[in-house]
Design a protein with these regions (language model features):
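Nucleotidyltransferase catalytic core that binds NTPs
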Residues: 2-4, 14, 21-25, 29-35, ...
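N-terminal leader/targeting signatures
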Residues: 38-39
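Intrinsic disorder
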Residues: 8, 45-48, 52
Length: 279
């Protein structure tokens, strides 16, 4: 889930999704899947049976582009909770302008990034709902309610967010309901000092919700928080985009397959890959 002081990451603005992702009859399952066929080796999330009591851990965001910092957070959460992490690309979050790459491109880059990564799954709930409900604004609480309807009331569900997003959590749509409907796993950066930046209203609402261990989140459907304190990397999507646009050194910020994709597509004003010399 991306940083920001308003509802972030999981939602879409006015259901907006580029036409390239709607090419086959407006059907998300048909239009996205063929385009992902070249990204072999990635795993796609399927909604588990309601009988399953395993914690469902959702990491939403624009992933524009997905970078090594995103992957470090996802891996750390996977290892801390010993469950898969479902990475959910958003179509167009309500709090920010349209992303630099369209939904299909970001979905393809995410699939490339997690190819061969055990326990990291692609989840297309947001993209599919944006196509099914064009023109309808969607927020994180909408996604959680949709997932809750599919999973059932008793399955533990958690959202993985950054500490900077938590600081503005009380500006999210129906944030108090969201606190009860799902757990929050907060990825912290060393020395960020986010605890001191929490608004008083939010700090009061979070008091008493912090879990003693990550395992505690599996014992309740929602309502708890856990701080994922790891030596996380400092990459950001805005840093990657700025370096690409400025002709700086950027390739080390993203997985190699994603760097190749960005070059080939000319995303973020990247220079296309040079053609191979004639033999």
């Amino acid at each position: 889930m991306t940083a920001g002081t308003r509802d972030s990451g999981l939602g879409t603005r006015n259901g907006k999704i580029p036409a390239s992702a709607c090419a086959v009859g407006g059907n998300a399952e048909q239009s996205l899947q063929p385009a992902l066929s070249s990204t072999s080796g990635f795993s796609e999330s399927r909604v588990p049976s309601p009988e399953s009591r395993e914690l469902q851990l959702i990491y939403g965001g624009t992933f524009d582009p997905i970078h090594n910092g995103h992957l470090a957070i996802a891996r750390a959460a996977r290892d801390a909770f010993a469950v898969p992490v479902r990475l959910m690309p958003a179509a167009d979050p309500p709090h920010r302008d349209a992303p630099g790459a369209d939904a299909l491109q970001r979905c393809e880059m995410l699939a490339l990034a997690i190819a061969g990564e055990p326990g990291l799954l692609l989840d297309r709930h947001e993209l599919q709902r944006a196509l099914a409900q064009p023109g309808v604004a969607s927020y994180s609480i909408d996604t959680v309610r949709e997932l809750r309807a599919e999973l059932g009331a008793d399955v533990p569900l958690a959202l993985l967010i950054g500490a900077d997003s938590l600081v503005g959590f009380n500006a999210w749509r129906d944030w108090r309901s969201l606190l009860d409907a799902a757990h929050l796993v907060v990825a912290d950066r060393a020395g960020s000092g986010w605890e001191r930046a929490l608004p008083a209203e939010l700090a009061q609402a979070l008091a008493g919700r912090w879990a003693a261990s990550p395992q505690a989140l599996a014992g309740a459907p929602g309502g708890l928080l856990w701080c994922l304190r790891q030596p996380l990397r400092s990459e950001s999507a805005s840093q990657a985009r700025a370096r690409i646009a400025g002709g700086g050194d950027w390739a080390a910020l993203v997985p190699a397959a994603v760097a190749d994709y960005i070059r080939a597509a000319g995303l973020y004003a990247a220079a296309p890959a040079a053609p191979a010399p004639a033999s």
